[in-house]
């Protein structure tokens, strides 16, 4: 009778490996399972972890090894049910300590699956998108206009200040000075008719200077004051043509003049008051000249006192170019203060 030998190993079992993954990964897996249970995230099929084979015998197709060494036939994988069952088995295995020698070995076909999967991208893509709620429309009258960033906030003349401050900022290209010389027409030459017109820009450069032939017969040339003589009318521009040329220059600009209403009357033209600056009615100039504010000072006297310059001298008469340039220089002396005054007290057209 043969002897039966038993080989028993009473040593300690092999130590268990540490839980797979770090704490951050376990936290992510926990959140992912929670989303899977709530239906926000579809369960993902992953390849089972690798374990050492218990037997050297090759496994046949469709069979998996058991712990006791026997082989068990496994059903063919299905599209959805196997994915759910495999993910369920993975969840149960992950909850327990990972014992590599108890998990089934993967097949060779499963080894071709990519091991690293960007779970974070799938996790974010599966989350429901948050819809932005539209803001409620405010009722009419409830909206408040915000105060301007660069401007006075506590002014009762905001509209007018914006109007005049915008005009004054464009003065170099939008401001001109005009002066006209007249001759006498009509009965006894008592009607003043335009015979010369000069326009200068903000810097005093001449924009227009022409002799103009009145539509009526000239009775008095008024040479002592106007400087106009008969020979000046030989090649003079007809009044209608000259008037159209002048009005094109004045259109949309601030027009400065001394007793400018006489010039507009000779042109048969009315310029907007908001764009008109008359140096004969600016009290600031009189104050600088130490004259009564309500007094009407002549252009000659203001130029002498404030600019220390003599104009309209001699017997040759006035020069409309010289007068227009002097008028512009006088206005520049009080330009800032007078524009602020007009912003607070805008004239009515």
Swiss-Prot record:
Residues 70-87 have a biased composition (Low complexity). The gene is ISG20L2. 3'-> 5'-exoribonuclease involved in ribosome biogenesis in the processing of the 12S pre-rRNA. Displays a strong specificity for a 3'-end containing a free hydroxyl group. It is an enzyme of class 3 (hydrolase). It is found in: Nucleus, Nucleolus. The keyword Nuclease applies. SMART domains: EXOIII (SM00479). This is Interferon-stimulated 20 kDa exonuclease-like 2. Residues 24-47, 130-142 have a biased composition (Basic residues). Residues 14-23, 54-66 have a biased composition (Basic and acidic residues).
């Amino acid at each position: 009778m043969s002897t039966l030998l038993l080989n028993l190993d009473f040593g300690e079992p092999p130590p268990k490996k540490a839980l797979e993954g770090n704490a951050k990964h376990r936290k992510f897996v926990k959140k992912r399972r929670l989303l899977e249970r709530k239906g926000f995230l579809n369960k993902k099929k992953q390849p089972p972890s690798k374990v050492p084979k218990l037997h050297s015998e090759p496994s046949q197709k469709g069979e998996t090894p058991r712990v006791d060494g026997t082989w068990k036939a496994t059903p063919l994988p299905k599209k959805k049910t196997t994915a759910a069952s495999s993910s369920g088995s993975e969840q149960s295995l992950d909850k327990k300590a990972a014992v590599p020698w108890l998990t089934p070995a993967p097949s060779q076909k499963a080894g071709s699956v990519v091991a690293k999967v960007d779970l974070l991208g799938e996790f974010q893509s599966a989350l429901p998108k948050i819809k932005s709620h539209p803001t409620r429309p405010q009722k009419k009258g409830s909206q408040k206009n915000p105060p301007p960033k660069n401007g006075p906030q506590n002014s009762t003349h905001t509209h007018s200040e914006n109007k005049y401050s915008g005009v004054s900022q464009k003065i170099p290209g939008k401001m001109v000075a005009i002066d006209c010389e007249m001759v006498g027409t009509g009965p006894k030459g008592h009607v003043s008719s335009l015979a010369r017109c000069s326009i200068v820009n903000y810097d005093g450069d001449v924009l227009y200077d022409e002799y103009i032939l009145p539509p009526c017969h000239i009775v008095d040339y008024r040479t002592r004051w106007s400087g106009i003589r008969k020979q000046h009318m030989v090649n003079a521009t007809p009044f209608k043509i000259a008037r159209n040329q002048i009005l094109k220059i004045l259109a949309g600009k601030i027009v400065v003049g001394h007793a400018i209403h006489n010039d507009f009357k000779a042109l048969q033209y009315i310029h907007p008051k908001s764009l008109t600056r008359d140096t004969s009615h600016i009290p600031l100039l009189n104050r600088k000249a130490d004259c009564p504010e309500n007094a009407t000072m002549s252009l000659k006297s203001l130029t002498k006192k404030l600019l220390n310059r003599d104009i309209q001298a001699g017997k040759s008469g006035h020069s409309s170019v010289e007068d227009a340039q002097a008028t512009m220089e006088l206005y520049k002396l009080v330009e800032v203060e007078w524009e602020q005054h007009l912003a607070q007290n805008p004239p009515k057209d």
